[in-house]
């Protein structure tokens, strides 16, 4: 069984701030750091650290993407399916406040240049029963899902960032949804408690397994037979950046 993480690769510019910048405000940051990032990359690193052999597919810029490839290789992620394109690598501007909370502005760059030709080549390497991990920061997600379904791969979707494109994807092909309450509300088109959202998702996607993350309240898993509630192990928060991606990687790592 192989795991394919088909997702974004970003250069994260992280600014530590006293508070998030308000409209019209100019403010000095307390610190500036540069990290590897992107939901796809974060999930691949978490998968690799969970002990899983993972192949990452996606795209970076020829001039500024080597840093990200080196980061993936360091933890054992296979990078031969990543394309290097004559465009800028995707990047993010992240504000992180004193409490460790963040807000993020994305530039898609090479992440939005994934082509069907590349996808066809990547999918030739995988087969029945392999896992595909997806989020919503790259182009051609719907086509990737279609090809994975034809291969009888197990499709895991983290519908983040949540936007109108999600509803154009063949969501009935998804085997696992991993999402937070905000994403669940948007996907269902309804407000509600965690339990209510879980039931709505199960009605909408009866064949899928649902993992709903609830922040400091933990998470809930639901499939056709059972519901499992998992509380959190409390720690002092340093930075919430990539927390959801790390959860996704280790959850799937536990299945594989």
Go through each PLM region and give its residues:
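Short, conserved phosphate/pyrophosphate- and ester-handling motifs at nucleotide-, phospho-/glycolipid
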Residues: 47, 180, 244
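A glycine-rich helix N-cap at a beta->alpha junction
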Residues: 71-86
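Conserved phosphate-binding/catalytic loop of the ribokinase/pfkB sugar-kinase fold
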Residues: 56, 82-84, 94-131
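Conserved phosphate-binding/catalytic region of the ribokinase-like
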Residues: 3-4, 164, 194-256
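Glycine-rich phosphate/adenosyl-contacting loop at the front of the ribokinase-like
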Residues: 1-59, 65-70, 237
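Short gly/ser/thr-rich secondary-structure transition/capping motifs
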Residues: 76, 112-117, 156-162
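Conserved beta-alpha-beta core of the PfkB/ribokinase-like small-molecule kinase fold
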Residues: 131-195, 217-219
């Amino acid at each position: 069984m192989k795991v394919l993480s088909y997702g974004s690769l970003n250069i994260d510019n992280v600014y530590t701030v006293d508070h998030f910048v308000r409209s019209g405000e100019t403010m000095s940051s307390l610190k500036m750091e540069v990290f590897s990032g992107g939901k796809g990359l974060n999930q691949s690193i978490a998968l690799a650290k969970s002990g899983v052999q993972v192949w990452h597919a996606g795209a970076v810029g020829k001039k500024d993407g080597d840093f990200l490839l080196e980061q993936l290789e360091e933890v054992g992620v296979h990078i031969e399916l990543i394309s290097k394109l004559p465009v800028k690598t995707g990047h993010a501007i992240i504000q992180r406040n004193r409490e460790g909370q963040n807000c993020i502005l994305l530039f898609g760059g090479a992440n939005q240049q994934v082509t069907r030709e590349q996808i066809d080549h990547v999918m030739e390497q995988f087969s029945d029963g392999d896992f595909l991990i997806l989020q919503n920061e790259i182009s051609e997600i719907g086509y990737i899902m279609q090809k994975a379904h034809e291969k009888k791969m197990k499709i895991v979707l983290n519908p983040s960032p949540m936007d109108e494109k999600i509803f154009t994807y063949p969501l009935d092909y998804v085997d696992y949804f991993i999402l937070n309450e905000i994403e669940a509300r948007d996907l269902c088109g309804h407000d509600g408690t965690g339990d209510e959202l879980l039931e709505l998702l199960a009605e909408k996607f009866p064949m899928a397994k649902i993992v709903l993350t609830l922040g400091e309240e933990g998470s809930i898993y639901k499939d056709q037979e059972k519901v499992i509630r998992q509380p959190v192990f409390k720690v002092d928060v340093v930075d919430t950046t990539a927390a959801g991606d790390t959860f996704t990687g280790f959850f799937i790592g536990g299945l594989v």
